[in-house]
Amino acid sequence: MANVVVVGAQWGDEGKGKIVDWLSERADVIARFQGGHNAGHTLVIDGEVFKLHALPSGVVRGGKLSVIGNGVVLDPWHLVKEIATIRDQGVDISPETLMIAENTPLILPIHGELDRAREEAASSGTKIGTTGRGIGPAYEDKVGRRSVRVADLADRATLEAHVDRALQHHDPLRRGLGIDPIDRNALIDALTEIAPQILQYAAPVWKVLNEKRKAGKRILFEGAQGALLDIDFGTYPFVTSSNVIAGQAATGVGLGPNAIDYTLGIVKAYTTRVGEGPFPTELEDADGQRLGERGHEFGTTTGRKRRCGWFDAALVRQTCATSGVTGISLTKLDVLDGFETLKICVGYDLDGTRLDYLPTAADQQARCTPIYEEMPGWSDSTEGARSWADLPAAAIKYVRRVEELIQCPVALLSTSPEREDTILVTDPFAD
């Protein structure tokens, strides 16, 4: 049975939630493998909107096992609230349908406080555009071997020892940033209080998933954010604090690399970005505003307006390579309806030299100007199309040109937020 990884191939917000939900019908297990609740997925099911941040998208589908893997950093208080919200919408969530890896690091209140204080202290031009939810500092503690992990909640003495180790690091940082010292006892009490609500879902996820795989069950790995925010291959330092590319999927749940059979890259038919950092095809004119309005480009997590621009084939070709993308899902094609002319970035000019990739150095990225190829647009609507026959000829040509430029085929084409409005070319779960 095929196992599929879904990754964003741009700067996030590509429409992964809908595609994961669409694919989850074919999967037995849906697993989150990186990130925190700084990324949001919006699902529209039978007209009802579900907004998820920490929970895997599969929770809204009955009969599926949803998993939060060790590659995630988890805010336990946020998770409990999110579970309550989704339950209020009629979704059943129990230890039979949700598992959390025992070795998942926790996001503590001290992480969010540090995150926000750093961003406020940063000078103009050095702000990352973080959501302030503590994801970066939580990953720092993981790498620094001072995390409080899910399993630590089960024993008070162990919990206290891990909290003390973290405070040895955090208290000096807080003094330097002018933040009050941490109330150790209050933090331990808060963790002790929340512990039973988290521990009921705790499990050796690596073992469970290896057994599922041996039994021939289909696993869908759900990525958050996008490959251009990857800590190694993104537009550093304007990136997230985890590996986002497909290779992280196995590591982030405790499976070997041979567990991945198909990598589906989610690609928006234009480009958006939230927060700071380079964006070669950004439009600050009427076309950019039109893309934002038609695409409803506001962040699920923060409500921040997204920056919008033309499709960047050079960047997507790059992310398809670093994630080993087998095929893409092209989303929001309908947002381009009505444009007389469309532009696609095919490369960059850097100080007179043409490049077919975005360079690594931040100063060079900032100096790259896009080289465009123009294509005719279309006036007919593509919204709700469910077959190629429903698409205008110019829209089909646009899709085919995207495939040529990124050197990767379209497996799925999405034409609205509704899960049924999807054109299937290749089933990623096909054996």
UniProtKB/Swiss-Prot annotation:
Name the pathway it acts in: Purine metabolism; AMP biosynthesis via de novo pathway; AMP from IMP: step 1/2
Q: Where does this protein reside within or beyond the cell?
A: Cytoplasm
Entry protein name? Adenylosuccinate synthetase
Give binding positions for GTP: 12-18, 40-42, 306, 332-334, 414-416
- Quickly give the catalysed reaction: IMP + L-aspartate + GTP = N(6)-(1,2-dicarboxyethyl)-AMP + GDP + phosphate + 2 H(+)
Entry's InterPro entries?
Adenylosuccin_syn_GTP-bd, Adenylosuccin_syn_Lys_AS, Adenylosuccinate_synth_dom1, Adenylosuccinate_synth_dom2, Adenylosuccinate_synth_dom3, Adenylosuccinate_synthetase, P-loop_NTPase
A GO-annotated cellular component: cytoplasm
Q: Which GO biological process categories is it annotated with?
A: 'de novo' AMP biosynthetic process; IMP metabolic process
What cofactor does this chain's UniProt record say it requires? Mg(2+)
List all membrane-crossing ranges: none
* Entry binding sites for Mg(2+): 13, 40
State the similarity comment: Belongs to the adenylosuccinate synthetase family.
Going by the UniProt record, its keywords in alphabetical order are: Cytoplasm, GTP-binding, Ligase, Magnesium, Metal-binding, Nucleotide-binding, Purine biosynthesis
Q: What is its EC number?
A: 6.3.4.4
A GO molecular-function annotation = magnesium ion binding
Q: Which gene encodes it?
A: purA
Taxonomically, the superkingdom here is: Bacteria
Instruction: Please tell me where substrate binds in this chain.
Output: 300-306
| Residues annotated as binding IMP | 13-16, 38-41, 131, 145, 225, 240, 304
Oligomeric form and interacting partners: Homodimer.
